[in-house]
Amino acid sequence: MTITKIHARSVYDSRGNPTVEVDIVTETGLHRAIVPSGASTGSHEACELRDGDKSKWGGKGVTKAVANVNDTIAPALIKEKLDVKDQSAVDAFLNKLDGTTNKTNLGANAILGVSMAIAKAAAAEKGVPLYAHISDLAGTKKPYVLPVPFQNVLNGGSHAGGRLAFQEFMIVPCEAPTFSEAMRQGAEVYQKLKALAKKTYGQSAGNVGDEGGVAPDIQTAEEALDLITKAIEEAGYTGKIKIAMDVASSEFYKADEKKYDLDFKNPDSDKSKWLTYEQLAEMYKSLAEKYPIVSIEDPFAEDDWEAWSYFFKTYDGQIVGDDLTVTNPEFIKKAIELKSCNALLLKVNQIGTITEAIQAAKDAFGAGWGVMVSHRSGETEDVTIADIVVGLRSGQIKTGAPARSERLAKLNQILRIEEELGDNAVYAGNNFRTAVNL
């Protein structure tokens, strides 16, 4: 079915920054996608094109990316008369039109908006939900797998004030029997945590960060983990709800000294207290012995490959590469060869097309890795990643706390998918790392 119209516009994300929205019109109607954007970004990500004009939106405008869709991509793609159901042909055409390896020319935000909208148009033409179309594109088997929601309930690092260096602490309801039950458990723990934070740290500690988590004035990881453990206990889920961390350690890595500064938000940080990667690895291991931690993301800096391989040999939990791999086939291949981690954080906007995102997941699955589909800190009401996580059978999604509509939009979409699929879907539960094989 041919495309009759492609139109992009600038809209706003959850942080009030401009982002790209793309409409594609075919005989089945209008198909719309909005692109997200990240706060702590890996240096090897596909290029998110921003205007750079400091007098407007602080330089974060996307009028160039929007113009690239309207003036360059739209006429070329319509003229090409490609079938919207042939996602790989469309994405290959977009990449060829851009002509660079990391989408610098047109912008990954321009290309991805089109790629996502194309997938929605194709699903409509086939008369199937988007997750079913993604499943066809990826060639995944049935039954469908509903993911474990990794809920970011407490923020530190560059997402929050306070001295806490680690960026995200997540609750993981992997013992729940169903996705909807996992959501209930997560929401109940979140409410307890919020009340506890206010009681312990004062009223303002209940305020939420970019991803819906609370950000009390916490100094150490232990303090954060104790608070979460207490909330889990008060909600009655001790032993049933696990914990995951996204350390985002590239943010506090001192490359010249090859050390990690856990007091990086303090300009007068004491250099003698900076840690080597071996010391940091020991810290993770002792935390994992004390608390029910099942997954650690970005435990080391994106260029500290030696540290990753060292940790991999000694830790048997899930080690997720995000800044390390940036959803990029070359870095994923390198991480597989060097045995750096055992799971991929899949952010569609890091690679810039649906086809390449699916391929990245397949590469990871092929190495026996887990795949966690992820939102970005600057999100929108677009729910494409909810359909992607179900279509890929990846079994784990990270899309914030059960708070803020742009986070809940994805989780609510998975609730609808769960209802629609009924017995044709299983909840990943404790098998979240190997869900693709269920």
Curated annotation (Swiss-Prot):
Record's subunit section: Homodimer.
UniProt: Mg(2+) binding residues: 246, 297, 322
UniProt cofactor(s): Mg(2+)
GO molecular function, one term: magnesium ion binding
Highest classification ranks of the organism: Eukaryota, Fungi, Dikarya, Ascomycota, Pezizomycotina
Protein name per the record: Enolase
UniProt binding sites for substrate: 159, 168, 297, 322, 374-377, 398
Subcellular location, record wording: Cytoplasm
